[in-house]
């Protein structure tokens, strides 16, 4: 039975990796594929077994990262030890989260385990020196933007442009009426319930982000309500994971 270990560090990685796992499940030769590691609800819905909570890795900023550092280092050590011994996979796939995944990939590659990384770190924008560690840790980089492969070619790192996993889910010409109907269906509302101005409020996908900036978002919502009196306003707040619903409702 083929084994794939993968790690997504936050909801965005979970969202990106789920279509990949779905595609693998449709390949006849991959029947019986065992997928495990760290992932969110979307990856788990595709049959992945998450052995550690993804929320441990979902931190924002230096202060939060420092506070969580002992737990993150402990988790990474446990993960590496597991994957080098009883949970040894045929392939390791790191999804984004380079600060965590590159360290794991480096140790696994040294042990002879093929390593792939989905979503290139933004070395073309900042911290270009990371290419050296990437070349040591990653056997093949899976790029979501076409221009990134040229950077890896020059550095002698194998790469493949795979496209953005979510590109096919976002229409080039959005149908506003259809979108409203889908929202009403999802929230079990009458179609007339969303007449007026609909405003999406996106306070983030990490608990630390929400704790820091959600109050500002709610103040802004109140300000808009006061300034746009007479207009029918609807504020929609998508929740990245079930655990984030409670702090937002509070």
Task: Give the ranges of each region predicted by the language model.
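Short beta-strand segments at enzyme active-site cores
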Residues: 94, 199, 236-238
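Catalytic donor nucleotide-activated moiety binding site of glycosyltransferases and closely related
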Residues: 233-250
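Charged active-site motifs of nucleotide-sugar-dependent glycosyltransferases
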Residues: 2-3, 191-200, 233-234
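Long, highly charged amphipathic alpha-helices
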Residues: 19, 23, 216-219, 247
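Conserved catalytic-core segment of nucleotide-activated headgroup transferases in glycan assembly
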Residues: 16, 206-238
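Short, solvent-exposed coil/turn linker segments
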Residues: 53, 190-193, 244
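Active-site and donor-binding regions of nucleotide-sugar-utilizing enzymes
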Residues: 2-187, 202-210, 223
């Amino acid at each position: 039975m083929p084994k794939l270990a993968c790690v997504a560090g936050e909801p965005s990685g979970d969202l990106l990796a789920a279509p990949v796992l779905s595609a693998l499940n449709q390949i006849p030769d991959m029947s019986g594929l065992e997928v495990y590691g760290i992932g969110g609800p979307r990856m788990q819905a595709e049959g992945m077994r998450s052995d550690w909570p993804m929320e441990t890795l979902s931190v924002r900023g230096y202060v939060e990262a420092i506070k969580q550092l002992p737990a993150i280092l402990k988790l990474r050590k446990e993960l590496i030890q597991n994957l080098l011994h009883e949970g040894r996979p045929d392939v390791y796939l790191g999804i984004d989260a380079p600060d965590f995944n590159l360290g794991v990939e480096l140790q696994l590659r040294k042990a002879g385990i093929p390593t792939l990384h989905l979503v290139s770190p933004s070395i073309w924008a900042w911290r270009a020196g990371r290419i050296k560690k990437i070349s040591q840790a990653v056997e093949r980089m899976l790029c979501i933007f076409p221009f990134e492969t040229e950077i890896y070619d020059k550095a002698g790192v194998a790469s493949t442009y795979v496209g953005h996993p979510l590109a096919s889910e976002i229409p080039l010409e959005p149908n506003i009426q259809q979108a409203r109907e889908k929202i009403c269906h999802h929230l079990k509302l009458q179609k007339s319930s969303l007449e007026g101005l609909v405003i999406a409020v996106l306070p983030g996908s990490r608990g630390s982000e929400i704790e820091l900036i959600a109050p500002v978002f709610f103040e802004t919502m109140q300000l808009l309500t006061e300034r746009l009196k007479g207009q029918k306003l609807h504020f929609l707040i998508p929740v990245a994971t079930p655990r984030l619903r409670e702090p937002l409702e509070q």
